[in-house]
Structures are given as structure tokens and as C-alpha cells.
């Protein structure tokens, strides 16, 4: 389905990003596994992709740093020569109530979760416009639609991603580049596993399908959006939340 397409997945060393990278590879894509800290985990993902008979490289880059992002794009093109798919997945949390939130907690989340999406989108557009094709998939969150107490920075960033997705889609459509977002709900990862059991139980009550999502529930939708099956979709945000927000 994605044979010999080149995909960049940011924050791909673990969790949802790892699942996305592996799912794209299973569909035939070669993958750039971006990471910012855990090189060993990123290399494990690369090895798994290579075991499928696909090509992969791990590239360290802080997505909030435009120079890092440009270097990642240069390395990608030197190895693969095209960039067909960008998945903006990298993200962090620094939760706190508004009245207690420190400026660096706000800035860190906005810089990674929103500015990082802008930096990577900007960096790939020239190549995708030259190719007259491309797929950009941005990972937002259901809380970017609904809001969530104690996460003003994260919610603002993820809501911003939805707006950026729409503007990017309108700007790039004439060059056959689609831009869509996904809004996952409560997905079981090492990040969410740290939440207290009572918090998890309360979340579960809000989900009509009565279970937490798995990373594969998210990655399968990303793979669809990267495929020809989604060629007439752009500017959309797909909820992957078990019906939590309707």
C-alpha cells in the first residue's frame, strides 16, 4: 500500500510513535525514526523495521529547534531522496493548574507540541511541493477539542495543532499535499500507565466502548491517512477515543 514511500515519524522511539513507525513499515514504507533522547529505543525500532525488509534510520532532533529539524530533513533526503509522509507525533506533558503553572512548563509544551509541528511541516513542504505530492498527519488530542483541567498548556497546544492542520491543508492542497489530524483519547502507553488507578477508573467511565485504546488503534488510522484511500481527505481531524467526545 505504501511501497517504497518515505515516512518521517517524530517521537517514534516509544508509545504511539513507535506503533505508527512499525505500522507504516508493515504497509511498505521506509521510515525515519526521530527521537530526542532515547537512542537505544530508537535503534530497536529501526531494527524491527529492517527485520520486515524495509529501510530505516534513527535521527536525533529536537523538533522545537528549527536547525535540528532542517538537519533531519537533509539526512532523510541524503538517504532516501524523497519525503512522502510526515507524522508529527512528538509531544510532552507538563501538567499543572493554571494558577500554579510555571512559565517554563507552558513554554516547553507549546514549543514541542505546537511549534514542533510547525517546524517540521515547514521543513518538508518544499520537497513535497517539488514532488507535487505528500501526506502530513498531525497528532493532536481529544482534549484539544474538549479541554481538560490541569492541562492548559497541553490543551492549548493540541487545539493549536487542529487549527494549524486546517490552515496547512488549505495552503498546500493545490500541490496535492493533504494535511489531516488525529485526536486520540485515552491510549494505553507508558505515559498514561503512570496515572493513578482512580484517575484511570474515572476516565474509563467516560468511554462508551468501555476500554482504553491501544497504540495500534491510532497507528492503523495514521496508515490509512497516509494511503491512497485517503487521497480525497484534507483538513480533517479524526477522533480515536472510543466515543468519549461526540
Curated annotation (Swiss-Prot):
NCBIfam families reported in the protein's UniProt record: 3oxo_ACP_reduc, PRK05653.1-1, PRK05653.1-3, PRK07231.1, PRK12826.1-2
Coiled coil (UniProt feature): none
UniProt cross-references to Pfam families, sorted A to Z: adh_short_C2 (PF13561)
Binding site for NADP(+): 11-14, 36, 62-63, 89, 154-158, 187
Subunit structure: Homotetramer.
Record keywords: Fatty acid biosynthesis, Fatty acid metabolism, Lipid biosynthesis, Lipid metabolism, NADP, Oxidoreductase
Record organism: Bacillus subtilis (strain 168)
Top-level class of the enzyme under EC nomenclature: oxidoreductase
Residues the record lists as binding substrate: 141
Biological role: Catalyzes the NADPH-dependent reduction of beta-ketoacyl-ACP substrates to beta-hydroxyacyl-ACP products, the first reductive step in the elongation cycle of fatty acid biosynthesis.
This protein's pathway: Lipid metabolism; fatty acid biosynthesis
Transmembrane segments: none
DNA-binding is among the record's keywords: no
Recorded catalytic activity of this chain's protein: a (3R)-hydroxyacyl-[ACP] + NADP(+) = a 3-oxoacyl-[ACP] + NADPH + H(+)
GO biological process, one term: fatty acid elongation
Active site, renumbered: 154 (proton acceptor)
Protein name, per record: 3-oxoacyl-[acyl-carrier-protein] reductase FabG
GO terms of molecular function: 3-oxoacyl-[acyl-carrier-protein] reductase (NADPH) activity; NAD binding; oxidoreductase activity, acting on the CH-OH group of donors, NAD or NADP as acceptor
Keyword Lipid metabolism annotated: yes
UniProt-listed Enzyme Commission number(s): 1.1.1.100
Superkingdom, natural source: Bacteria
Family: Belongs to the short-chain dehydrogenases/reductases (SDR) family.
Amino acid at each position: 500500500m505504501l511501497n517504497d514511500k518515505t515516512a518521517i515519524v517524530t517521537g517514534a522511539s516509544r508509545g504511539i510513535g513507535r506503533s505508527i513507525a512499525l505500522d507504516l513499515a508493515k504497509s511498505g514504507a521506509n521510515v525515519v525514526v526521530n527521537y530526542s533522547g532515547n537512542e537505544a529505543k530508537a535503534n530497536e525500532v529501526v531494527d524491527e523495521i529492517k527485520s520486515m525488509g524495509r529501510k530505516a534510520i534513527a535521527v536525533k532532533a529536537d523538533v522545537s529547534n528549527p536547525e535540528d529539524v532542517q538537519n533531519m530533513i537533509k539526512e532523510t533526503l541524503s538517504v532516501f531522496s524523497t519525503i512522502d509522509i510526515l507524522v508529527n507525533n512528538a509531544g510532552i506533558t507538563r501538567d499543572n493548574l493554571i494558577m500554579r503553572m510555571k512559565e517554563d512548563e507552558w513554554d516547553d509544551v507549546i514549543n514541542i507540541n505546537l511549534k514542533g509541528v510547525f517546524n517540521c511541516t515547514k521543513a518538508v513542504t518544499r520537497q513535497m511541493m517539488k514532488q507535487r505530492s505528500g501526506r502530513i498527519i498531525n497528532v493532536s488530542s481529544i482534549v484539544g477539542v474538549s479541554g481538560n483541567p490541569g492541562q492548559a498548556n497541553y490543551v492549548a497546544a493540541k487545539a493549536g495543532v487542529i487549527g494549524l492542520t486546517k490552515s496547512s491543508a488549505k495552503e498546500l492542497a493545490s500541490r496535492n499535499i493533504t494535511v489531516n489530524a488525529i485526536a486520540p483519547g485515552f491510549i494505553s502507553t507508558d505515559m498514561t500507565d503512570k496515572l493513578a488507578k482512580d484517575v484511570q477508573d474515572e476516565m474509563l467511565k467516560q468511554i462508551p466502548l468501555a476500554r482504553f485504546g491501544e497504540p495500534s488503534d491510532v497507528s492503523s488510522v495514521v496508515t490509512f491517512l497516509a494511503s491512497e484511500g485517503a487521497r480525497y481527505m484534507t483538513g480533517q481531524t479524526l477522533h480515536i477515543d472510543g466515543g468519549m467526545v461526540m
